[in-house]
Amino acid sequence: VHLSGEEKAAVTGLWGKVKVDEVGGEALGRLLVVYPWTQRFFDSFGDLSSASAVMGNPKVKAHGKKVLDSFSEGLQHLDNLKGTFAKLSELHCDKLHVDPENFRLLGNVLVCVLARHFGKEFTPQVQAAYQKVVAGVANALAHKYH
């Protein structure tokens, strides 16, 4: 992902304030509620029968944190996202058979959750930088599908 110095500073500056457990759980939970067909990849998570069940599900929260921990790793290697996410791409493609469009959906949901958590601090410029990053991460995760 090509970010200007200003964009990189905006992304990393805000990310330093992100509570990955909270934001990750909310982002994954919202993905599962807003796009219910994504739930089929999470059969082992138990009760996903309603929005409140999804948002309160400890397995959703734990996996959301895991997802954002990986995203954090990607932020350290913006110049090599494909390399950083190669193993995860392979896992999601070959073993889990996740539709790569879901990575784009989750990235967009993450941007919404960040906007909700950071309000005025999440300026249009910060949003634009994050959109570039989540698109780059989604492309890297979809890499093994091509």
Curated annotation (Swiss-Prot):
UniProt xrefs under Pfam families: Globin (PF00042)
Q: Name one GO molecular function term.
A: organic acid binding
Give expression by tissue: Red blood cells.
Q: What is the lineage of its organism?
A: Eukaryota, Metazoa, Chordata, Craniata, Vertebrata
Function of the protein: Involved in oxygen transport from the lung to the various peripheral tissues.
Q: What's a single GO CC term here?
A: blood microparticle
* Name of the protein in question: Hemoglobin subunit beta
Q: Does the keyword Nucleotide-binding apply?
A: no
- UniProt entry keywords in alphabetical sequence: Acetylation, Heme, Iron, Metal-binding, Oxygen transport, Phosphoprotein, S-nitrosylation, Transport
Q: Could you tell me the Gene Ontology terms of the biological process aspect for this record?
A: hydrogen peroxide catabolic process
Q: How does this polypeptide assemble, per the annotation?
A: Heterotetramer of two alpha chains and two beta chains.
Q: Which residues carry this modification: S-nitrosocysteine?
A: C93
InterPro entries tied to this protein = Globin, Globin-like_sf, Globin/Proto, Hemoglobin_b, Hemoglobin_oxygen_transport
Q: Which residues form the Globin domain?
A: 2-146
Phosphothreonine modification, residue list: T12
Q: Which residues bind heme b?
A: H63, H92
Q: Which family does it belong to?
A: Belongs to the globin family.
Q: Point out residues bearing the modification Phosphoserine.
A: S44
The PTM N6-acetyllysine maps to K59, K82, K144
